Each structure stands twice: as C-alpha cells, then as structure tokens.
C-alpha cells in the first residue's frame, strides 16, 4: 500500500520569493467553496463539523490513543463518500514528526470502516479486490511529510501555501506531534509549551485560513490531571485523552467554548470505540 501514498521530501520544499497574486473575488469564492466538507469526520466529537479552518488539539498521556485517533480521522477524511462509506473524499497533509504514525494501522482502520458500513443493495462491494481498490485510490489523497528536526519543521510550516496551491482538495492539515521539537527550539529560551504552541498556530493559521483548511495536531501531556486550563481563542476543540486508573478503560474530555463533555472509550484493533451515555442522546 505504501506505493500509493504521496510522500513530500523536505529537501524538495523551497522558500520562494513572495510574488503578488492577483485573484478576482469570483475566483476566491470558487476556490473556497470547492473545498470538501469535513462533516462526519468523527460524529461523536463533532456533531456539526469540524468546520474548515477549525483548530483541533488532541492531548493526552502516552499510550492514550492520540496518534490512533488522529489516524482514524485521517481514514475518514480520505475515504470516498460513495458506496455509503460516508467518507469526506478530501485530501490531507500529515506532518510526521514523532514517527509514531503507522501506514499499516491506517490501512487497517480504512478496511474496518468499509467492512462495517451498512452498504445498500445497489452499491454493494462484492469482492476483496473492490475494497483494496478503494483503499489504494483513497491513499492517494494523503500527502505525508516526514520531518526530523526543528529547522525542517519550521520550513514546512512557512511553505504550506505552496502545497495548498498544488491541491485544492486538501481540507485537513494533521501534525503528529506539534511539540516534537519543543526542547530543540527552546533550549536557550525558556518558554512554556502553551506559548510555544500558540506561536506555531499563529504561523499555521495565516495559511490555513486563506485556503480554508482545518488543523488537527497531537501533543503530549504527562500530567494531564494537573494541567486543566481554559480553552484559548486559538483552539476550537480541545480533546484530552486519559486512561482510567487501575482499569483498561479510557476517558475523553472534549472542550469547546460552549461545552465540556466526558466520553468513555476503548481502544480496539479496528478503531476507537466511544461509549455514549444514553442520557446524552
């Protein structure tokens, strides 16, 4: 499956001199309106979204499922919206800094989504070949940038507009994780992680807002129970993942400006399964 992915080498990314770009209002409106919708990306977490340009943070302790949840969202993003699969049929960029992301796991999640779909009689997927073809075609929607140091990461963030211009179907920017080079960047200058992330998001938002692209990033929180902070204006959804003490269960705290919800979940080989309290329905 790896041959069907699009890898962007950092060395191929160049900083180009700024050139004036002339675009009519009609052209701008067309470019923004043609962007695929991310509605249905993860219905349990985003009942009416996420909207394009939203910022979504996935935080949590080690082994709480941060990269797994991100992979599940990427699978939904790049899968088609036909065959009753209800994918977003959108392209996505993954900036891979921690190198915890596994292609094999993404393919497994995509296969699981297809297998569990309630397929209508007229659109039935009859053979394994058809499922494999769908997965291979969908993987072409994912652009992966492997990053190995803070200088490469900075270069990538400042040249995102070139990548967005080359593919108008890109609706999602994923970063795993945004804090991978925190210590490299801040070894000579004491900066809090929140301040560091805020600085990076400012750079990211300048380009994602222009091109109508949502952002999802992961970050490690070692002391999640002691790190309760108010949602900032830069983040639209804050997702905190945590393992319940002396248990195999997990709990997700979802925070927006309007609400704070706690959702229990389990991590299975075929994806994260949410356990919704019937009183919330």
Show which residues each predicted segment covers.
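Phosphate-binding/switch region of NTP-binding enzymes
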Residues: 194-198, 202-281
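Conserved inter-motif catalytic segment of the P-loop NTP-binding fold
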Residues: 88-187
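Preference for well-ordered, secondary-structure-rich cores of eukaryotic proteins
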Residues: 36-42, 63-64, 69, 147-152, ...
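Conserved NTP-handling cores and scaffolds of large molecular machines
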Residues: 81, 110-117, 185, 208-211, ...
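The Walker A/P-loop phosphate-binding site
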Residues: 4-123
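Hydrophobic/aromatic beta-strand patches that form the interior of the parallel beta-sheet core
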Residues: 56-58, 93-95, 143-145, 216, ...
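Intrinsically disordered, low-complexity regulatory regions enriched in Ser/Pro/Gly/Thr
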Residues: 50, 85-88, 136-137, 208, ...
